């Protein structure tokens, strides 16, 4: 996956979370369609500048691989939490400004001023593809550990 392929996905209507989740078909046992649908509402921090959609998709992938689904399964829950915290640590090393779109972009898409800045500087195509690539890289590392 490259920044260019991510940008091309964006141009075709596939958003950040969908791009990230879609890279993990084999690891999750889910189809590309299912992964994209699962992450379809995350774009631009749920269009509020909140938690980055790529990060939310990473959490979904971690949950699909390591999540617990039975009451009292503290061991599995513990493993999932360790993976999530490791992802947070590694992503935070790359993006110390935070996990929210408005922090990562330096502008809040949910405000007219922020939306204007994002559009004028083309941040969704200049910055977000790199973030998506970094999320995938970090997540692959976390899964392999």
Name each model feature, range by range:
Residues 12-16, 30, 127, 131:
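Short, contiguous, pocket-lining structural segments
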Residues 57-65:
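DPxDG-like acidic metal-binding loop motif
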Residues 3-11, 41-50, 120-124:
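A short glycine/serine-rich beta->alpha loop
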Residues 81-145:
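C-terminal binding/interaction regions
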Residues 20, 38-43:
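Short alpha-helical scaffolding segments that buttress acidic/His motifs in well-ordered protein cores
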């Amino acid at each position: 996956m490259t920044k260019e392929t991510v940008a091309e996905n964006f141009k075709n209507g596939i958003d950040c979370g969908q791009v990230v989740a879609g890279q993990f078909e084999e690891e999750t046992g889910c189809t590309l369609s299912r992964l994209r649908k699962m992450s379809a509402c995350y774009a631009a921090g749920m269009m509020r500048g909140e938690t980055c959609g790529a990060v939310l998709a990473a959490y979904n992938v971690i949950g699909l691989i390591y999540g617990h689904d039975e009451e009292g399964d503290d061991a599995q829950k513990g493993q999932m939490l360790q993976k999530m915290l490791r992802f947070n640590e590694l992503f935070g090393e790359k993006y110390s400004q935070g996990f929210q779109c408005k922090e990562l972009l330096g502008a809040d898409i949910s405000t007219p001023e922020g939306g204007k800045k994002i559009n004028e500087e083309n941040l969704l195509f200049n910055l977000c593809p790199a973030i998506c690539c970094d999320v995938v890289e970090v997540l692959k590392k976390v899964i392999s550990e």
